[in-house]
Amino acid sequence: MTEMIEGRNAVLEAFRSGKCVDKLFILDGCQDGPVRTIAREARKHDTIVKFVPKERLDSMSETGAHQGVIAQVAAYDYSTVEDILKKAEEKGEPPFIILLDNIEDPHNLGAIIRTANLAGAHGVIIPKHRAVGLTATVAKTSAGALNYTPVAKVANLGQTIDELKEKGIWFVCADMDGEVMYRQNLTGPIGLVIGNEGNGVSRLVKEKCDFTTAIPMNGDIDSLNASVAAGGLAFEIVRQRMAK
């Protein structure tokens, strides 16, 4: 389960011992020396910091003695992008990576990790900010896939795409206005980019992609759930790879 660490000393030691802290919650207006020290550690580790009212901290606290700070620690350890590339290399396969642009719903993230595993993707990449991390809900929804599928967390998704392009990976972005997926070549080293539940892939990330693709739809509404879209596109990649 996601671990909540409460109290100033405990939170500070969590950072200093190298625990992966997803979010740090600090009491609104709390600016004394120990809290500033904790906030510095959070910035050093690129942890999301949220200032919240006392009522929020009290409702999150299990001990009733949070001292104005609570840290949310990831339920699972994160991998690195290099770990994902190494997995592809070890399997002798062209890399297949799913990148998620600001997915906020833990059920969607868990479902996408499950899909990634079943589709043979070598890993999933998520951003550090404005996105859900590896919570207990994500782990449960993944139905065990999180134990086998590397998930890397990066500070800048666009920059990561640029770096992976230098390694020969092409990037396709899910977009309603893209070319129908059956008409595109989705074989070879590929990164599939799936966007936020409400807004899709952000403009800056979309501009980094080599092309856009769409799932053909014939219904009365205009969009799929993020995890469903990821599944449809991921298994089109599987189909094309198997047909080669």
Per-segment meaning from a language model:
Residues 53, 74, 101, 127-128, ...:
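Short beta->alpha connector loops at strand-helix junctions that form conserved
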